Amino acid sequence: LEEGEITSKVKFPPSSSPSFPRLVMVGTLPDLQEITLCYWFKVNQLKGTLGHSRVLBMFSYATAKKDNELLTFLDEQGDFLFNV
């Protein structure tokens, strides 16, 4: 990192909740100029909802104009997709 850059780490504890962990920022950051996503995942079974092309959302970045400005997800075939 260079001087003045902002970095954060977030650790989600195990959850017995049926909903996925969610991080909501309190306050604001400078406008997003670039982003790096890096994660590892292993999917044992995909259960799609009839009529939905997205089965498992992995990451979503919302803006004031659009809920899923950046979205990574797995589709019914198990393909990893990135939408901007």
UniProtKB/Swiss-Prot annotation:
Transmembrane segments: none annotated. It comes from the Eukaryota. Ca(2+) binds at D67, N68. GO terms for molecular function: carbohydrate binding; metal ion binding. Its cofactor is Ca(2+). Binds 2 calcium ions per subunit. Keywords: Antiviral protein, Calcium, Disulfide bond, Lectin, Metal-binding. InterPro entries: ConA-like_dom_sf, Pentraxin-related. Residues 6-84 form the Pentraxin (PTX) domain. Pfam families: Pentaxin. One of its GO terms (biological process) is regulation of defense response to virus. Gene3D superfamilies: 2.60.120.200. A disulfide bond links Cys-38 to a Cys in the C-terminal half of the chain of 163 residues. Lectin that binds sialic acid. Displays antiviral activity and therefore may contribute to defense against infections. Belongs to the pentraxin family. Homopentamer. Pentraxin (or pentaxin) have a discoid arrangement of 5 non-covalently bound subunits. Displays strong antiviral activity against the rubella virus (MIC=7.2 ug/ml), and relatively weak activity against herpes simplex virus type 1 (MIC=44 ug/ml) and the rabies virus (MIC=32 ug/ml). A possible carbohydrate binding site is located between positions 14 and 20. This is Limulin.
